[in-house]
Amino acid sequence: MRIIATPMARILTAFLAALVPVATLAGGLDDFLAFNSGTKTATARFEQQVFDRAGKVVESASGTFAFARPGKVGWAYDKPHKQVLVGDGQKLWIHDPDLNQVTVKRMEGAMSSTPAALLAGRDDITTLFTLKDAGSADGLAWVEASPKAQDTGFERVRLGLNGKALAAMELHDQLGGRTLLRFADLKPNAVVPPQTFTFAPPTGADVIDDTPKK
């Protein structure tokens, strides 16, 4: 099973909402709101685990990511397979070097109301998600985000914060599966080169363009 093809397209899409403008909320969400409002760009490393309904790890992966608000993201898997997702705010490119294949999607359709929208989306996050304090566990304060749309492919996303720094994201899908991402070396408001969010298909790659044609 290819990592990106299943939970990652959805994760990347919940990941893009946590950096959208947020209406004022009170209580245990303060750290998340501070991170949300104060972070315009970031880079980090991540470790990803996918669990089945019985809690067994069925996939593990690692890599790096960068984002810039609004709507720009670069997500690269190093292990176990090299795969890349790049979004420039208009289009999302998914590159699988092993297959020499590039898929192009309209970013708005691919990312709205998904986990990636939690970090770099364009809209007020409260129009896409219902947010609530989810208490503390594993040394982190958790916030739960439930999508208001019905066709997102996941039930809820949990965001774990260490102070005002995002440390983890946990995606619960509608089939009882769970994907956990833990972040390291997170650098809020890092200088991210513009080319991080641009992509040109390699020569000879099979390009599948799913964007609307004018």
What do the predicted segments below correspond to?
Residues 2-15:
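Bacterial N-terminal signal peptides that target proteins for export
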Residues 54, 98-100, 175:
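Solvent-exposed strand-loop boundary residues in beta-sheet-rich modules
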Residues 103, 126-130, 136-211:
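Gly/Pro-enriched, hydrophobic low-complexity segments
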Residues 27, 122-131:
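A short, amphipathic edge element
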Residues 62-113, 179:
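An acidic-aromatic
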Residues 19-58, 201-214:
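N-terminal leader/targeting segments and the immediate start of mature chains
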Residues 36, 111-126:
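Short, solvent-exposed helix-to-loop capping segments enriched in aromatics
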